[in-house]
Structures are given as structure tokens and as C-alpha cells.
């Protein structure tokens, strides 16, 4: 996840080595100043399995060394 400095959006990008995908989403409240983080593919797949509802919301907490998703 990455927040471009000049755009008020949350940018998510992914690649499998051959293809590149990008999604821009509305920046949630309180996310200003959030650093860019790399989330491993296995973690993203586990989240997709747990969050089967398209409308489900998650909380993201980011520090210099960790990213917590709840």
C-alpha cells in the first residue's frame, strides 16, 4: 500500500513478475502520514479468505517495523 504524496488516495499495487495491477482507493480518515508498506502475498491471500464480504472493513495500524491488520 502506498499513499502518493500529491494525491489524496490510497494506492495498492501488485505484481507477479510479469503483470502489474494498481488500484486507487479513497484515503480513510486518520490515514494522513501513513508510510508505504509492503504486504506479502500470503498475507493478502489470507485476508481475502477471511474477508469474504466485499463490504467488510478492516483496521490497519502501521509502525516503522510492523503492519497490523484487524
Curated annotation (Swiss-Prot):
* Listed Pfam families: DNA_pol3_beta_2
* Subunit note: Forms a ring-shaped head-to-tail homodimer around DNA which binds and tethers DNA polymerases and other proteins to the DNA. The DNA replisome complex has a single clamp-loading complex (3 tau and 1 each of delta, delta', psi and chi subunits) which binds 3 Pol III cores (1 core on the leading strand and 2 on the lagging strand) each with a beta sliding clamp dimer. Additional proteins in the replisome are other copies of gamma, psi and chi, Ssb, DNA helicase and RNA primase.
Molecular function (GO) terms listed? 3'-5' exonuclease activity; DNA binding; DNA-directed DNA polymerase activity
Q: Which GO terms describe its cellular component?
A: cytoplasm; DNA polymerase III complex
Alphabetized Gene3D superfamilies for the sequence: DNA Polymerase III, subunit A, domain 2
Query: Which BP terms in the Gene Ontology apply to this protein?
Result: DNA strand elongation involved in DNA replication
Taking the first listed entry, what is the main subcellular location of this protein, grouped into a coarse class? Answer: cytoplasm
Name the record gives this protein: Beta sliding clamp
For this UniProt record, the keywords arranged alphabetically read as follows: Cytoplasm, DNA replication, DNA-binding, DNA-directed DNA polymerase, Nucleotidyltransferase, Transferase
Transport keyword on record: no
* Protein's job: Confers DNA tethering and processivity to DNA polymerases and other proteins. Acts as a clamp, forming a ring around DNA (a reaction catalyzed by the clamp-loading complex) which diffuses in an ATP-independent manner freely and bidirectionally along dsDNA. Initially characterized for its ability to contact the catalytic subunit of DNA polymerase III (Pol III), a complex, multichain enzyme responsible for most of the replicative synthesis in bacteria; Pol III exhibits 3'-5' exonuclease proofreading activity.
Q: Which cell locations does it reside in?
A: Cytoplasm
Amino acid at each position: 500500500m502506498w499513499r502518493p504524496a500529491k494525491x489524496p488516495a490510497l494506492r495498492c499495487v501488485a505484481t507477479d513478475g510479469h503483470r502489474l495491477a494498481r488500484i486507487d482507493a479513497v484515503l480513510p480518515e486518520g490515514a494522513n502520514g501513513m508510510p508505504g508498506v509492503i504486504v506479502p502475498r500470503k498475507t493478502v491471500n489470507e485476508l481475502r479468505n477471511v474477508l469474504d464480504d466485499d463490504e467488510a472493513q478492516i483496521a490497519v495500524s502501521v509502525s516503522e517495523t510492523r503492519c497490523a491488520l484487524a
